[in-house]
């Protein structure tokens, strides 16, 4: 950071992101007294931002909770092994580096030129969930932000025919872990600017050489075009995800359409 203007911008932005993070945590009761929170740190802008916000909140919160940072070294070629340990040591944060060669497995299974992100993320999730259980972690914190949630909603809508996004808090399918997304109310624009001002040592996410998920790229571009025409478009879409009327949809599991009968008419 080079000048006072940047410092002032950082201070203002940090307060803004911290406020949104605290709102999400409070609204969804993400953190409880005595929690042991595992921050999944990839070396990307969002996970750095998540760790910073939780460390700031830890100092101010009326409750006590523990934070550990965990990185999964998947043995991708060119992965800078020293970056995260050096950063976390300087921050004074307890951390663990898990080493698993998932890269070789993914390369063996996925055909050349195809995106490896799906299989890679499933394997990564399983390893991190196992570590959380073995180390008595009560909450697994992920760095997904508002834009990730909106993009996932449209991916499921356009390509899977389902109305589904990313919840701010969930109990894993196997009931072994609780996952939280404290940055759920924070935009990608905010995490990007914050990471640039903080000068985080970013580790590229494409070391594996995988192609981008073209469906997600399409959705992101579409949303950005909408946002250019209407700067509040993403906010309105995000608001809609917490303003759902099951009786106005078509899902018989969410609303009892079958048993609506003439006997219900009141005149």
UniProtKB/Swiss-Prot annotation:
Pfam families cross-referenced by the UniProt entry: ATP_bind_3 (PF01171)
Identification of the protein by name: tRNA-cytidine(32) 2-sulfurtransferase 1
Coiled-coil residue spans: none
Gene3D superfamilies given in the database record: HUPs
Main location as per UniProt: cytoplasm
Pathway of action: tRNA modification
Other noteworthy facts: The thiolation reaction likely consists of two steps: a first activation step by ATP to form an adenylated intermediate of the target base of tRNA, and a second nucleophilic substitution step of the sulfur (S) atom supplied by the hydrosulfide attached to the Fe-S cluster.
Cofactor comment: Binds 1 [4Fe-4S] cluster per subunit. The cluster is chelated by three Cys residues, the fourth Fe has a free coordination site that may bind a sulfur atom transferred from the persulfide of IscS.
């Amino acid at each position: 950071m080079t000048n006072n203007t940047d410092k002032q911008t950082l201070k203002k932005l940090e307060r803004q992101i911290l406020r949104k993070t605290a709102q999400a945590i409070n609204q969804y009761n993400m953190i409880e007294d005595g929690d042991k929170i595992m921050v999944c740190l990839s070396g990307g802008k969002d996970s750095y931002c998540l760790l910073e916000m939780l460390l700031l909140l830890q100092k101010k919160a009326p409750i006590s909770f523990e934070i550990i940072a965990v990185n999964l070294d998947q043995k991708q070629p060119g992965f800078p092994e020293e970056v995260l340990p050096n950063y976390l040591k300087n921050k004074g944060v307890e951390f663990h580096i898990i080493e698993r060669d998932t890269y070789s497995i993914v390369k063996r299974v996925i055909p050349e030129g195809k995106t490896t992100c799906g299989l890679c993320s499933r394997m990564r999730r399983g390893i991190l969930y196992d570590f959380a259980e073995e180390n008595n972690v009560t909450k697994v914190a992920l760095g997904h932000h508002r834009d990730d949630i909106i993009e996932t909603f449209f991916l499921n809508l356009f390509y899977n025919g389902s109305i589904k996004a990313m919840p701010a808090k969930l109990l894993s399918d196997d009931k072994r872990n609780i996952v939280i997304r404290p940055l759920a109310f924070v935009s990608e624009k905010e995490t990007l600017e914050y990471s640039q001002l903080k000068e985080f040592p970013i580790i590229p996410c494409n070391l594996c050489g995988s192609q981008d998920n073209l469906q997600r790229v399409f959705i992101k571009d579409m949303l950005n075009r909408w946002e250019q025409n209407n700067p509040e478009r993403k906010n309105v879409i995000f608001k809609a995800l917490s303003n759902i009327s099951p009786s106005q949809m078509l899902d018989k599991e969410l609303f009892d359409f079958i048993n609506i009968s003439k006997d219900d008419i009141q005149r």
